[in-house]
Amino acid sequence: MKTLKKIIVLAVLVGMIFTSCKKDSAKSSSSLRVKIHASNKTFSLLKAGSLTPGFAWDTCYMNVSKVELEAEKKENESSQDSTNIEFEWKGSKKVDLFGINSLIGDISLQPGVYDEISIEIEAFKSDAGSSPVFYLSGSYTNATEIKIPVVVIVNDDIQLKVESKEGTKLNAVNDYMTMINLNLILLMNGILKSDLDSATRTNGKIVISSTSNNSLYTKIKGNFDSCEDSEFDQD
């Protein structure tokens, strides 16, 4: 099956705040919590240079199989020597991307300073079973104010690769959280009003999948490469 790849640049919030619970300086490890969230649940569509009524999404989930972290680790800030390390979390887990708690999993970090960080998230059809790897549903409102149900079903393997900005460092005396935002506006980039008005409907619903409205599916599938929106903060 085809693999969808995505590079997301992490934005580092410099003004990090300490958590309400004080950390024990002698603790054996810290953690990096990895979350995924879908942003922009409602937005308009482009028609001949102007915006028209568009999408309102109500359900979005992904079946995540694995999270891998790779980084360069130093014992402390002044150390000149570094070691390439890898950590791994394995699921699978169905994550509600519109939910308050969209946590995928926690990666344990041994004490030290980490930079050149990359996080790889993989979602395999073999782990999803009868469920989609990625699922998005809601409605499309056309120019005459008629709401039409829309469903996007991705059953290909998905691989998301997250890379930190140059200069980003994690000091593992603290816990951290990375929030990966899938920007739904960017995911639907290139989908026009005319595309949806002419789309095939199944029982009154626009189903976008590998077997239904394939041209729209191909556009959306390609857009996973450019949904670049994320946050990185101390937990």
PLM region spans:
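C-terminal motif of bacterial Sec signal peptides marking the signal peptidase cleavage site
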Residues: 17-20
